[in-house]
Regions:
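Serine-dependent carboxylesterase/thioesterase catalytic core
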Residues: 4-20, 177, 204, 220-324, ...
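Structural motif
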Residues: 165-166, 230, 258-259, 331-334
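Surface-exposed, flexible loop/turn segments at secondary-structure boundaries
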Residues: 181, 212, 246, 274, ...
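Generic hydrophobic alpha-helical membrane-span motif
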Residues: 136, 183-184, 250-252, 276, ...
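Helical cap/lid subdomain of alpha/beta-hydrolase-fold lipid enzymes
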Residues: 37, 44-88, 262, 268-430
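Flexible, membrane-associating and regulatory peripheral segments of lipid-active enzymes
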Residues: 1-186
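Active-site catalytic motif of lipid deacylating hydrolases and related acyltransferases
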Residues: 165-237
Length: 430
């Protein structure tokens, strides 16, 4: 490819038959096209992982070629080539090297999840600017290569332990979502987690309650779903893993709706068991007219998206400190169910984007730490409570803990985190 990139200069410097030169250039052009579009991924890899590896390889070759080409340009300046020939050679080299890099970028864009959208925007406006584009190409290469190694390691790990079925629990797993979301088929609330559990032997089902409503209403829907799963699987009970308000819904169903005889374990993830005091503060300051306006718009939107009778305000009010205190007083834990809770926290306002970064600031006066929505004190519930300790400045947000952004976070593998939870359930006979 370097030969093709420097064809204008080599045409003048190499004294051979013109027809032979033309033939060589055609062959070099064909080779370059094949190289750009051929799969270069690791043997044994497949699908997006292979495309990601291939894209990183092609982009890496392009970046390396750009460095070598810079040296070649300097050397050519000391030859007998005239200015026009040097300019033509430089333009040819620039075009071929850029096409090579863009070929890698396209493959990465088709398969990578860890490349930031902002990078694509910057690339769109700077791909033709020398040096700047090289800096961006390098960023893409490092991100793609890092993601490839991480994902391939996950696949290798799953393959090595596949026969052990470490997540094959006695009872099926029921994953109950939090407020303002639904269990859509296209966009999974739990990100990459369910597939990871299934690959390791778990039987996974979803709560399918509405996006927002009173705890008592959502709990009724969760209770119906528990009965459906038991009827479908023939299992005696289910293991519930619930995030955010889903934990309150599940506790209500267990204690008030007779689901304790059908639930073996309840694991709550970042659930506001003792409420969100900043919600009390906001509701006390926002005029009722604005609250009503937001409620109507939200309910209309989510009715169109599949909810039967959503209620934004009812759901929000049941997250207040006052309502959660009343819920706790009237909802004792069942002796038939094994409870455990998990909580995380953000370490700075930069740990997450909007609206969790705003929630982080609003929550600061009410506890020693929070995840952007729930304080640590509110999320740790019962005797079997665990705090996720994350090294570094980032921390783990309310969204990170359910893989909302599908991001590979350094020192926190969210998929393996859930594998460990379910693995422990299996080891304990659940």
């Amino acid at each position: 490819m370097l030969l093709l990139a420097n064809a204008p200069a080599l045409w003048k410097l190499i004294d051979i038959n013109s027809l032979l030169k033309t033939l060589i250039i055609i062959l070099l052009a064909l080779y370059t096209l094949v190289f750009m579009f051929k799969s270069h991924g690791r043997k044994g890899s497949h699908g997006k992982i292979r495309r990601l590896d291939s894209g990183a390889f092609v982009l890496g070759c392009g970046v390396l070629q750009s460095v070598i080409q810079l040296i070649i340009v300097i050397v050519l300046c000391f030859t007998k080539l005239n200015g026009w020939r040097l300019l033509a050679n430089a333009l040819c080299a620039y075009a071929i090297t850029t096409l090579l890099c863009l070929s890698g970028i396209v493959r990465i864009a088709a398969s990578a999840r860890q490349v930031k959208i902002l990078w694509y925007v910057i690339m769109l406006f700077t791909w033709y600017i020398p040096i700047v584009n090289c800096i961006m190409f390098r960023k893409f290469y490092k991100a793609a290569r890092s993601e490839y190694y991480f994902e391939q390691a996950k696949l290798d790990l799953d393959a090595a332990r596949k026969e052990n079925e470490i997540c094959k629990t006695k009872y099926p797993i029921l994953m109950v979502h939090g407020i303002f979301f639904r269990d859509w088929q296209v966009i999974n609330y739990w990100g990459r987690v369910p597939n990871e559990l299934i690959r390791n032997g778990a039987e996974v089902y979803y709560g399918k309650q509405q996006s927002a409503n009173k705890v008592s209403v959502s709990a009724t829907e969760v209770a119906e779903r528990i009965k459906e799963v038991i009827a479908e699987t023939g299992a005696e009970k289910v293991n519930i893993i619930a995030h955010s308000k889903g934990g309150l819904d599940s506790r209500y169903a267990i204690s008030h709706l007779g689901m304790d005889k059908y639930v073996a374990t309840l694991t709550t993830i970042n659930t506001p068991h003792y409420g969100c005091k900043f919600v009390d503060m906001l509701l006390g300051k926002i005029p009722e007219s604005i609250q009503g306006f937001v409620d109507r718009k939200y309910n209309k939107l989510f009715t169109a998206l599949g909810d039967k009778d959503p209620s934004f305000l009812d759901g929000v009010y049941d997250l207040t400190y006052k309502n959660c205190s009343e819920l706790n007083a009237s909802t004792p834990d069942s002796q038939l169910v094994s409870y455990r809770s998990v909580m995380s926290k953000m370490n700075s306002i930069r740990s997450a984007g909007f609206p969790l970064n705003i929630g982080y600031l609003l929550n600061k006066p009410y506890g020693k730490g929070n995840d952007g929505l729930v304080t640590v004190e509110s999320g740790l519930y019962g005797e079997n409570a665990k705090m996720i300790e994350h090294k570094g400045k980032r921390g783990i947000s309310h969204g990170d803990v359910i893989d909302l952004f599908r991001e590979n976070i350094k020192d926190f593998d969210v998929r393996e985190f859930y594998v460990d939870i379910v693995k422990e359930l299996k080891e304990q006979g659940f």
